[in-house]
From Swiss-Prot:
Residues forming the catalytic site: K115
Binding site for Zn(2+): C408, C411, C426, C432
GO cellular component terms given for this protein: cytosol
Organism: Shigella boydii serotype 4 (strain Sb227)
Family matches, as HAMAP family: DNA_ligase_A (MF_01588)
Keywords: DNA damage, DNA repair, DNA replication, Ligase, Magnesium, Manganese, Metal-binding, NAD, Zinc
The protein's name in its UniProt record: DNA ligase
Function, as annotated: DNA ligase that catalyzes the formation of phosphodiester linkages between 5'-phosphoryl and 3'-hydroxyl groups in double-stranded DNA using NAD as a coenzyme and as the energy source for the reaction. It is essential for DNA replication and repair of damaged DNA.
UniProt-recorded Gene Ontology molecular function terms: DNA binding; DNA ligase (NAD+) activity; metal ion binding
Assigned protein family: Belongs to the NAD-dependent DNA ligase family. LigA subfamily.
Enzyme Commission number(s): 6.5.1.2
Binding site for NAD(+): D32, A33, E34, Y35, D36, S81, L82, E113, R136, E173, K290, K314
Length: 671
């Protein structure tokens, strides 16, 4: 007679097998009623023997007790977003950029997937067992949704198969099929509950329930699209190969994933998916196109927040017709004058739209737009509403011409348009209240100086009351002065002052980004900081020297040079430093002066280390003059291979690069 443990093991194995056939292979072997019977049998046994319940049991999907709040999980590998293209011309331009960046006219194949309209999640498996799950969040830190993800039957609690890595982070999209969405809303209408506008909102709301038992009742599902952390194992060297391997281990992958050999095949895939879109049974808003070769992906690299080797090719957004009631002009951080159409409110793609961007004067002329016109509105990328065209055949008789301002609508300064540029700009600089507001909002933003609690409404009041003119004035604010603002009590005022004090300690890269120099985003600011090391060196740099920084061309170099040449900007920087803004001094390492076997070498770490953390090893190597890289290439001098080293070790051996183990690294570090 079988023991209770054996019965439980067999039941769990059987249920996992049928979950795999149903959710991954779409080929169920048994009726739903039989699956339910097996599940009931397992539940009854575990109820009688709770000491034998395991975390990966299929019964553990039903949800734990409600959470008071979500804790945070920091992504070990950032969850980047994708750049978008919206037409064939833009995709072909992306294809050309990829081809141009690759050397020796290498052939590129593309892995094409559906762009699911759901919620991006990260799921970490250790030794094949699901241990945590998180939302994308800001790309660096997400919310811990482990308890909720465990309730989604499509997601395996335990991977099955061979050669499963010790640590594997699966990334993908949680979404709600149309049928499930309609059922949720039908139930909500009947019971007086919340009715969701679209399946994505319903999926997000379901996944972020503090009570996992509610999530368990929602018919969420999941498709994998990539990998994050990989330790103690190997994966295929192509994106498609990795997805197919995940499928073997029990992770759901869309059967619409397709390998395309050319740009023409990609376009054919795009149009086929667009044609099939209404019959898929779930929402998508485009296709995702990725370079299939992992080696080519490494060559192409990343920009600030997106890979160069992938793009989202969005479908045309839904469109509606409405009337333009007025055109107003907004002033941005750099003085750009942007015309905005004020519309008769209309629902577009589930959202009530009352404003739409008109971009610039050229766009108004191209459209032939007049105030009062009937227009077609599109939510470009399903995010930013824009005017597509004017319905000339239905133009009312009382329309009025749109007159682009010659003077700033906020400060009255002259508006100038540089020859060759589409954007007209206010020349008022920081005397313009609008520019001042937007500059200050940028300065305190999370990726700049990161002043917690300093919201847009506070900045608006500070400028309107003439309390603040430059970023340096922010650090002169007192709690007493802040309490004079609307909805600002003594406690909140003190919190803002404390946040400003904390923000004084920053990094050189963040400081440069916060200054708001034209065309200088996060990545460029980081590159400038790394190259020049000090503010003094950067201020003294010529346009020619600035162009030596990776990805800095003549236009960006000119903007940076002109910014520091302006006396008022230098004065603001001096004031900021006088108020205590500071960052760590750069560690200048001259490899030629260091007597170390690692000096001047490009080193790659792979596998797990037992005697020190990887971060500690990197720091020690840098101290000894090494440059630590993240991937193996022909430029790599040395690979340090820990336990369970994977594809990087194989590539190093293929290229004939010197490889040492952890013990040899420790010996050399000690020498």
């Amino acid at each position: 007679m079988e023991s209770i443990e054996q019965q439980l093991t067999e039941l769990r194995t059987t249920l996992r097998h049928h979950e795999y056939l149903y959710h991954v292979m779409d080929a169920p072997e048994i009726p739903d009623a039989e699956y339910d019977r097996l599940m009931r049998e397992l539940c009854e046994l575990e109820t009688k023997h709770p000491e034998l319940i395991t975390p990966d049991s299929p019964t553990q999907r039903v949800g734990a007790a409600p959470l008071a709040a979500f804790s945070q999980i920091r992504h070990e590998v950032p969850m980047l977003s994708l750049d978008n293209v919206f037409d064939e011309e833009s995709f072909l331009a992306f294809n050309k950029r990829v081809q141009d960046r690759l050397k020796n006219n290498e052939k590129v194949t593309w892995c094409c997937e559906l762009k699911l309209d759901g919620l991006a999640v990260s799921i970490l498996y250790e030794n094949g067992v699901l241990v945590s799950a998180a939302t994308r969040g800001d790309g660096t830190t997400g919310e811990d949704i482990t308890s909720n993800v465990r309730t989604i039957r499509a997601i395996p609690l335990k991977l099955h198969g061979e050669n499963i890595p010790a640590r594997l982070e699966v990334r993908g999209e949680v979404f709600l099929p149309q049928a499930g969405f309609e059922k949720i809303n039908e139930d909500a209408r009947r019971t007086g509950g919340k009715v969701f506008a679209n399946p994505r909102n319903a999926a997000a709301g379901s996944l972020r329930q503090l009570d996992p038992r509610i999530t368990a009742k929602r018919p969420l599902t999941f498709f994998c699209y990539g990998v994050g952390v990989l330790e103690g194992g190997e994966l295929p060297d192509t994106h498609l190969g990795r997805l197919l391997q995940f499928k073997k281990w029990g992770v759901p992958v869309s059967d619409r994933v397709t390998l395309c050999e050319s740009a023409e095949e990609v376009l054919a895939f795009y149009h086929k998916v667009e044609e099939d879109r209404p019959t898929l049974g779930f929402d998508i808003d485009g296709v995702v196109i990725k370079v299939n070769s992992l080696e080519q992906q490494e060559q192409l690299g990343f920009v600030a927040r997106a890979p160069r080797w992938a793009v989202a090719f969005k479908f045309p957004a839904q469109e509606q017709m409405t009337f333009v009631r007025d055109v107003e002009f907004q002033v941005g951080r750099t003085g750009a004058i942007t015309p905005v159409a004020r519309l008769e409110p209309v629902h577009v793609a589930g959202v009530l739209v009352s404003n739409a961007t008109l971009h610039n004067a050229d766009e108004i002329e191209r459209l032939g737009l007049r105030i009062g016109d009937k227009v077609v509105i599109r939510r470009a990328g399903d995010v930013i509403p824009q005017v597509v065209n004017v319905v000339l055949s239905e133009r009312p008789e009382d329309t009025r011409e749109v007159v682009f301002p010659t003077h700033c609508p906020v400060c009255g300064s002259d508006v100038e348009r540089v020859e060759g540029e589409a954007v007209a700009r206010c020349t008022g600089g920081l005397i313009c209240g609008a520019q001042r507001k937007e500059s200050l909002k940028h300065f305190v933003s999370r990726r700049a100086m990161d002043v917690d609690g300093m919201g847009d409404k506070i900045i608006d009041q500070l400028v309107e009351k003439e309390y603040v003119h430059t970023p340096a004035d922010l650090f002169k604010l007192t709690a007493g002065k802040l309490t004079g603002l609307e909805r600002m009590g003594p406690k909140l005022a003190q919190n803002v002052v404390n946040a400003l004090e904390k923000a004084k300690e920053t990094t050189f890269a963040r400081f440069l980004y916060a200054l708001g120099i034209r065309e200088v985003g996060e990545a460029t600011a980081a590159g400038l900081a790394a190259y020049f090391g000090t503010l003094e060196a950067l201020e003294a740099a010529s346009i020619e020297e600035l162009q030596k920084v990776p990805d800095v061309g003549i236009v960006v170099a000119s903007h940076v040079h002109n910014f520091f040449a302006e006396e008022s900007n230098r004065n603001v920087i001096s004031e900021l430093l006088a108020e205590g803004v500071h960052w760590p001094a750069p560690i200048v390492i001259n490899a030629e002066e260091i007597d170390s076997p690692f000096a001047g070498k490009t080193v790659v770490l792979t596998g797990s280390l037992s005697q020190m953390s990887r971060d500690d090893a990197k720091a020690r190597l840098v101290e000894l003059g090494a440059k630590v890289a993240g991937s193996v290439s022909k430029k790599t001098d040395l690979v340090i291979a820990g336990e369970a080293a994977g594809s990087k070790l194989a590539k190093a051996q293929e290229l004939g690069i010197e490889v040492i183990d952890e013990a040899e690294m420790l010996r050399l570090l000690g020498s």
